[in-house]
Curated annotation (Swiss-Prot):
Heterohexamer of two alpha and four beta subunits. It comes from Methanosarcina acetivorans (strain ATCC 35395 / DSM 2834 / JCM 12185 / C2A). One of its GO terms (molecular function) is unfolded protein binding. It holds the Pfam family Prefoldin. The lineage of its organism: Archaea, Methanobacteriati, Methanobacteriota, Stenosarchaea group, Methanomicrobia. GO terms for biological process: protein folding. It is found in: Cytoplasm. InterPro entries: PFD_alpha_archaea (IPR011599), Prefoldin (IPR009053), Prefoldin_subunit_alpha (IPR004127). The keyword Transcription regulation does not apply. Keywords: Chaperone, Cytoplasm. CDD domains: Prefoldin_alpha_GimC (cd23160). GO terms for cellular component: cytoplasm; prefoldin complex. Belongs to the prefoldin subunit alpha family. This is Prefoldin subunit alpha. It comes from the Archaea.
Amino acid sequence: MAEVSEEIRNLAARHQELQRQAEALRQEMGMIQTSISSCDQTIVTINELKAASEAGKPAETMVPVGFGSYVYAEVKNPDRIIVNLGAEFSAEETAEEAIETLNRRKEQLTKILEQMNASLTRLTQGMQTLEAEAAKLQPGQA
């Protein structure tokens, strides 16, 4: 009986560890999803600014000036975009190039998200396996 109790404790400890890993993975997945949404929104904004400029309208936007405050500004050249390349490097690109860069980044993030989702599935299956093992060990559950 003591062996069964010890085995159940071991299964519970392994289950808790898998739960912690799954929660950490879910948080990372949320951050990746936020980045994908940010790419989408940036592409929409670039297209809107470009369309306004091509229609002869002023391309207006709000520019953050700090502490949740913004000013309205007119974009003088909406076809030139400064794109973050990572590692604190940026490059000036045309609007089309910037959209291509953002779409590539989005594809990479989507692949990472798919891999993370597969990992989450494996963790969930591992937890279910541990739960089934624990149920077999408990008296009156067989």
